Amino acid sequence: MTWLETVSVTMDVSKNGFHRDLVTTVDFGPGFPDGLETLLVHRLPSGIYIDQYQLASLKEDTGLQVLLGSAVDLEAPAHTSEEFLVLVYPALDQGILKATLPIHGRYHKPSLAGKRFELVEIKLPKLILRTDTCTQLISFPPYKIVDAPCTVHNLSICQWLEIQHLQEQDPVSLEIPLGDGSLVEPVCAGTLLVTLLCCVILSRSIWMHGVFLDNAILI
């Protein structure tokens, strides 16, 4: 059994509410080579987003290295957004790496069927590996060769070895609160009624207490 066969990847979500941490842990076990570089490839669903400005701050504070596959609209609701690619370049420490990625729930359409939460599932990321000493990789089952940016700076493309046999884990899920769509009409009607009532009261107050001079009103 080679050290590649002992690699395991697990993922969990910490914190509550709309703002969570997606924590991925990779355990390589004994025998992994020196100079091993790792890349986690997340394909995240449209129901969540990542704040690139927060990532820039975390890079300075913690050294977190993240490359987004495309620009992320922080304000867009879930139904107008698309899934997106996130490349995480974590640091390996004594055969174990842990990458903590801050994620945020998007606004979802209100439910007309009384549904209170929308379940957003996040699948396990792909794990790909490379070393500077091995530049000519050979594909052999169950592993395959893929191309990806060499570093987070995205200046060049390298060959990586994608690990295929990872332990199966069910997707982790988030419950995103939904608004009650059945309340839209009553709320709109109530808002309109209150607005009209305020206009009537304000107009009556101006009419009763205003001083009319040459077609002008002085309060």
Region locations from a protein language model:
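C-terminal single-pass membrane-anchor helix
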Residues: H165-I219
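Non-cytosolic ectodomains/luminal loops of secretory-pathway membrane proteins
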Residues: M1-Q169
